[in-house]
Amino acid sequence: MLSWAITFLIIAIVAAVLGFGGIAGTATGIAKILFVVFLVMFVVSFFFGRRGRG
């Protein structure tokens, strides 16, 4: 799943350089959503992972 997020992030960066339109706008939207999802999962796993190993 992380590889898909990185792939869409790269597509979004290329789309931003070339201009937002059509598939570029869609890829940017997907990359933003995946970024937020993985950020939330990272924060949750960070806090619960620290508490479980003690």
UniProtKB/Swiss-Prot annotation:
| InterPro entries tied to this protein | DUF1328
**Keyword vocabulary terms for this entry:** Cell membrane, Membrane, Transmembrane, Transmembrane helix
Q: Which branch of life, at top level?
A: Bacteria
Q: Does the keyword Oxidoreductase apply?
A: no
What residue intervals traverse the membrane? 4-24, 29-49
Q: Where in the cell is it found?
A: Cell membrane
Q: What's the protein's topology in the membrane? A: Multi-pass membrane protein
**One Pfam family here:** DUF1328
Answer yes or no on keyword Aminoacyl-tRNA synthetase: no
Q: Record's Gene Ontology CC terms?
A: plasma membrane
Which family is this protein grouped under?
Answer: Belongs to the UPF0391 family.
Per its record, how is this protein called by name? UPF0391 membrane protein PSPPH_0249
What is the organism field in this record? Pseudomonas savastanoi pv. phaseolicola (strain 1448A / Race 6)
